[in-house]
UniProtKB/Swiss-Prot annotation:
Residues 1-24, 77-84 are virion surface. Residues 46-55, 106-228 are intravirion. Homomultimer. Interacts with envelope E protein in the budding compartment of the host cell, which is located between endoplasmic reticulum and the Golgi complex. Forms a complex with HE and S proteins. Interacts with nucleocapsid N protein. This interaction probably participates in RNA packaging into the virus. Belongs to the betacoronaviruses M protein family. It comes from the Viruses. PROSITE patterns: COV_M. Component of the viral envelope that plays a central role in virus morphogenesis and assembly via its interactions with other viral proteins. Coiled coil: none annotated. It is a multi-pass membrane protein. The lineage of its organism: Viruses, Riboviria, Orthornavirae, Pisuviricota, Pisoniviricetes. It comes from Porcine hemagglutinating encephalomyelitis virus (strain 67N) (HEV-67N). This is Membrane protein.
Length: 230
């Protein structure tokens, strides 16, 4: 004789239970949403790198959280229509998550920087300053880049990179790495303001399927040569 099948419990919420849940957790949810909103609103590399990193962590967690929720919807679908939509959303979320990882790995191979896994952008600005390679994310595909020296402090596109530099340390070329290619920006203008300040403007001059040099001992010109095709 076969043992009787245990019925699967049906989980459902009444309107009163939902209202009770919101009343109990409303304050905590409000604080969490406010915190996320502030981080997303003010998380820029030109303002605070610490806040920007927190913003990237939040964005990075969005995809796995979305996949978990869509799978949960598939398991506890209300009807076949909801099940169909949940399956489609799950497949789309997984595909986009895989594409993100593939593109990030390709960009990491090109630059060797962990900023390649930035979920916000696939544009990484690379500048070689006296043998030290700085890599930072930028949102847009700019036609020009501006490097500024203010009393020894180096800024490029408003992002602070380091200290102890002068105008003579600025390289002849700056690069922006993308998933499929590398853009080279040539220094077209340099102006000195006072003894320890000034700025330089770099103009996009070449695009190719290259990677950054594996060594950091070269100058800015060496970086611009873009050896080691991939």
């Amino acid at each position: 004789m076969s043992s009787p099948t245990t019925p699967v419990p049906v989980i459902s919420w009444t309107a009163d239970e939902a209202i009770k849940f919101l009343k109990e957790w409303n304050f905590s949810l409000g604080i969490i949403v406010l915190f996320i909103t502030i981080i997303l609103q003010f998380g820029y590399t030109s303002r605070s790198m610490f806040v920007y990193v927190i913003k990237m962590v939040i964005l990075w967690l969005m995809w796995p959280l979305t996949i978990i929720l869509t799978i949960f919807n598939c398991v506890y679908a209300l009807n076949n229509v909801y099940l169909g939509f949940s399956i489609v959303f799950t497949i789309v979320a997984i595909i986009m998550w895989v594409v993100y990882f593939v593109n990030s790995i390709r960009l990491f191979i090109r630059t060797g920087s962990w900023w390649s896994f930035n979920p916000e952008t696939n544009n990484l600005m690379c500048i070689d300053m006296k043998g030290r390679m700085y890599v930072r994310p930028i949102i847009e595909d700019y036609h020009t880049l501006t490097a500024t020296i203010i009393r020894g402090h180096l800024y490029i596109q408003g992002i602070k990179l380091g200290t102890g530099y002068s105008l003579s340390d600025l390289p002849a070329y700056v690069t922006v790495a993308k998933v499929t290619h590398l853009c080279t920006y040539k220094r077209g203008f340099l102006d000195r303001i006072g003894d320890t300040s000034g700025f330089a403007v770099y103009v996009k001059s070449k695009v190719g399927n290259y990677r950054l040099p594996s060594t950091h001992k070269g100058s800015g010109m060496d970086t611009a040569l873009l050896r080691n095709n991939i």
